[in-house]
Every structure is written in structure tokens, then in C-alpha cells.
Amino acid sequence: MGNNTFKSLTKLLDNRIHYVISHNTESKSDNDQVIYFDTLSEALIQANKNNAKISVIGGVQLIYDTLNIAHTIYTKITMYHSIVPLSVESDPDNVYFDFTKVPHHFILSSKNLGEFFGGCNIHTYTYTHPEYEYLNLIQDILCDGKLTQNRTGVNTITKVGCTLRIPLASNVLPVLTTKKVNYNHIVTELLWFLNGDTNSKTLSTQGVKIWDDNTTREFHANRINKLVTTYGSERVKDDIKIIEQYNEGDAGPIYHHQWRHWGAEYVNCDTIYTTGIDQIKRVIEQINIVKNDPLSPEGRRLIVSAWNVSDLDKMVLNPCHTLFQFHVLDGTLSCTLYQRSGDVGLGIPYNITSYALLTHIIATIAGLVPKELVIFIANAHIYTDHVTQLTMQQTREPMVWPTLLINKIQDIDNLTENDITVLNYKSHSHIKMKMAV
């Protein structure tokens, strides 16, 4: 707040640190709740370092200044002011501020102008670059999450129940731009899933190493030890026999196997499977039924699950992105994803792009228009050794997301990387984070 606004307060606000912007060198306070700054930039940078929730309460010049610089410093700010230009209240669409380029949540109240409007009118404006869904998730967890321990030995800041809504219209592929993301690796991994292949060496030979650490012989041995410690040797003896036969690179009956061969007994990654339920082909058939008959009971049953309880102990990792559901509405296709566990620094950026791409692919096959991806993260967490990197990422301004082109295909089994083209991806530099295993 400005110095005049601060002086107008009848008392200090509860549970708040008051940052006062004043060029008056004589301004000072002995109260720990009051800190003076020469410039707004200094105040916002300090608040951002402290992961603070920021509210700006005026005066008018401070509101203007905040709108001008907020996007370079902080991702979300709430601004309150009781006296605003009449044009804001009489015509909310004709305001003095540029609301289209600044990330903010701005509440304008005319309570001091009630004689003109018959009461207090409030208008809320929210900047909606879709990448702020992700950046605001980071801030939400850092502010409201709880420090917790977990199996990896690296503590996390955890929040239960978080949601992302990602638009997919106009051939947009959501790839984060506030850090460089290797979208080619995401394409390769998704096709690996869709092919039903559970050998991570297939990815490694293409330069994609993201599954290597979870499929080594050492990891398999540790997996057996953890199962025995958790459940006892008698409880998991049959699963142990299977895991002991895994060669290095074998991921077990994870996503791929469940998507394409649900129910088929898993032997190893070298076995060719011809039985089980092909959930991917089945859901495409169901989507086509619903497209032609909106009243079909299949409309709310377009579900693919990777959570096969009978196979969980045989997997190197239990599925994090557990279940997804498609929705056909007025010629469009949306996808909702239930994710039991989400590593916000490393995993979620991949999941956003991967399931958006999957939705585009299925929509292309079914002759529908992609609309939206909604992700529900049951346990959203930030590893403590990612906090510095993610805090820095929040200060970056998102760029335009790339365009996706997919060749018209009829059969999911005929899909190759040559059918997928990503255009005009631009981003900030790469941010290095270590994966906890």
C-alpha cells in the first residue's frame, strides 16, 4: 500500500505484514508488521521470496504501477481499491487498465460511490493465459501445502485435491513455455504406451531415458525388498517369482499393458500378448457410438484405467496417472484425468502435454474437435529440492503455446511419430530438477 493509504488505516490488519511504499526517508516503524520500501518492485520481489499471498490496496497510482510490472515479478496478485474511475463501474468492459496482459485477480469496489449506483458493485477480472493454471498450482502448494515425508527419502510440500483446466481448441498443444520441455520425448513415450511395449530400452535407444532409473536390476531387487517388508514374503511370493525373472529394462505390467491387454497374465516385456481387453480400441469404439447417438448410455462410460489391483505388485511403479475418461459434447472431445500422485516439478508438465496429445489423437481418429483437458491431482506435491527452481519459474512470463498437426488416421495401431508435427514452440531456458526415485 501507499503511505497515505497506510496512514488512513484505523488499525493494523490482522495476520498481515504491511509493505508500505514511500519515498519519505523519514518513514519508519518499530512494529514488525510494518516494513517500508522505496519502490513497489522491491516490495513485490521480497514478498515473492517469502512465498507470500499479495494484496494491493491502493492508492490509485499504486494500482496502475502494479498492473504495469506485476507480470514480471509475480503470478497472481489481488488488488483492492474503494474509489475507482467511474468508467469502470458504468462500463466494466471499458476500463482504464489493460487487463489482457497482466496475471492478476482484480476486485474493484464502488462502495464510496454508492450514491451513484445504489450500493456496492464488485467486478472481478482474471488473467487467463492457460499456463497460469500450472504456475498458480505451484504457488497454491507452496503457500497452503504441508511438509511431508515419503518413500523416496526427499521431503515434499503436499496438497490434497488440486485441479487444472487446460484448453485444447484451435489445434493448440499445451507445452509449458516458462521452461524448456522436450516435447519430442513426450511424443515418443506416449507412442510407447500406445504400442503396449513395457521394455524401457525401447525408449533408451531413442534417447529417452526417463524410465531407466526405475527398471534397473538394482531397482527390481529393491522393489522385492520393499514388498517383503510391507506385506511379508508369503503374501507376495508369486509376484516375487515374476519380478525375479525380469531383465533390466522390464517395467512390468504398467500403463501400456493395462491399456492394451487388461487381464492378460503378465510374463515379461519380451512376451507377445494377444489376449486381454484392448481398452484403447474399446474406448474409441464407444466414442464413435456416442458421437452418432448422444443418448447412448456409453456417454458417461468412456473410461480407460491403469489401476489393475491384481497386477500392482508386479509393476516397477504403480500408475500415477491412474484413470482417464473422455466426454463427447456437441462434436467436441474432452478428457478428464484422475492422477493419484503428481510430481508438480517434473511429472505434471509431462502429463499435461501427454494427455492433451492423446486427446488430440483420439479426436482425430473419431472425427471430433478437441476441447479441454481437466486434470484432478489427488496428491499434488513439490519436492523440497525443486522449490528454488519452481519459484524462479514463476517469475517467467508464458509464451504462446505451439500448434499441433496430426495426419488423418483411421486406426490407432497405424500411428507413428511421422503423423505428429509440433510447430512454433518457443520457451524460456531449461530448468534442471532431479527426479526422486
For each of these PLM feature ranges, what is it?
Residues 128-437:
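Terminal, non-catalytic protein-protein interaction segments that mediate quaternary/complex assembly
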Residues 1-129:
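Enzymes that bind and transform nitrogen-containing heteroaromatic metabolites
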